[in-house]
């Protein structure tokens, strides 16, 4: 594949999903920070949801960093345009500083701030920074900020932190080959990140900063603060920050329905996404990696090149045995990402449509870790897949290629959701009224689910795979999420958190979107009365029990029954002989902790009662 390269051009102005962010003069200026006592505020939008104590008691809302769970009225205020969305706050800051960015002379250096874009290939922000430095004849300096508080607040899994640090080692080597330093700065207090970046830029004599936009609430607000902070000061002290769209193939908010609103359903959004790319082929043009720094950069910035990659912060470290296992399973860096992409497109993408739901087969790309860490851009992935299609189209030709592209596009869709419905980042379901469901907080049930000891073989196999590898097949994510939320009626947000704390590919938008779908509380959900039957799912997607045997040691000796239906391995206590049951009990394999039919009825009743409440 030899994708076309982008030529130098001026970065487009950042647009906002709703047009002019300052146009609505009626908007309230209240923030999301509540008073110490949530029941004493005169602002009704600051009152917490009536069930807020449950979310705090069970670790869903981290009060160390965030306010109480907001009321449904506050979530609705975002929908009614009464509260500014964080994207609007950042867009306003960029608009206010646009003239400065255009006119400010380059001083001694240009900085690129790496975040979740840990690659040289097809990195728009890095390319723009490189072009700026090249035009001015000054060095490009790269920066990564390690914030232990952010890792804690965002529930970053130790396995993912380890992958990120290993990727930084690869990135540092690749940059050094170009004479570009990578400075890694640890900032203990997350709120001090903008100030520390400004201090570093001042010490380097840098005038311009480039970084990719992240769409979660914390990051949008942080970058809005940074943009304004860098623009402050006397004439010779001002700095410019360009926060550019790059994470998604199509910028969130760019696609609007016929009525001018934002899409809340994937299918029409995806059709609009396809149409937009076809009409704007530059969406899939690939950015070149940066050129080398000017001669003498290494001598001038010797201290920056001497920077080492730190170890993981306390609480985010792996044991030595985990490191050995995970490093073998998950090689880090963009070279591995591109190699895996090419291998998948060469060997498996053509059969993706028919194999993608079978966890015992190598039918998927296993690229989610690279999308999450930014070692591979969605643009490169989709461009590569499209170019392998005999039609050279996104939605025509090989069915496997079409299906895979549509699955990668879900990633864009869920980030689009974060931008327009920001309260989903704040422990609220997409449909606020679903907050009124009374969930169970049965600790024994939740623990059995996390440890793969529910007595439902397909559930237990999937959860044990996570504990062993930090990864789970997407079909299984849907099955285990539905089981937790509906069979056990445990608050889906506890499962959402558990996934983020254990998955190597934990991405907030995709994880939140997936849980919203499975628990029927999110955007484009399955109706709440549709409840996955774990037995039927097991028979359909692991018919011979190969996946279950791999991960549930207690069931490996059960006889194989090709074709799945009736096989003991799917329901050993319900279908096994007395001898089989006795052997399972001796091995310690648990009986089912709930009866599916009764659990389904309980879930439907809880959903009906919750949705009938007006809280």
Swiss-Prot record:
An MF annotation (GO) of this entry: deoxyribodipyrimidine photo-lyase activity
Domain Photolyase/cryptochrome alpha/beta: residue ranges: 108-249
EC identifiers of the protein: 4.1.99.3
Binding site for FAD: 352, 364-368, 505-507
Keyword Translocase listed: no
Bias kind Low complexity: ranges: 31-40
Required cofactor(s): FAD; (6R)-5,10-methylene-5,6,7,8-tetrahydrofolate
Record field: catalytic activity: cyclobutadipyrimidine (in DNA) = 2 pyrimidine residues (in DNA)
Entry GO CC: cytoplasm; nucleus
Biased composition (Polar residues): 11-21
GO biological process: circadian regulation of gene expression; DNA repair; entrainment of circadian clock by photoperiod
Residue span of region Interaction with DNA: 407-414, 474-475
UniProt KW keywords: Chromophore, DNA damage, DNA repair, DNA-binding, FAD, Flavoprotein, Lyase, Nucleotide-binding
Signal peptide extent: none
Ranges for region Disordered: 1-53
PANTHER family linked: CRYPTOCHROME, SI:CH1073-390K14.1
Subunit structure: Monomer.
Function description: Involved in repair of UV radiation-induced DNA damage. Catalyzes the light-dependent monomerization (300-600 nm) of cyclobutyl pyrimidine dimers (in cis-syn configuration), which are formed between adjacent bases on the same DNA strand upon exposure to ultraviolet radiation.
Designated name of the protein: Deoxyribodipyrimidine photo-lyase
Higher taxonomy: Eukaryota, Fungi, Dikarya, Ascomycota, Pezizomycotina
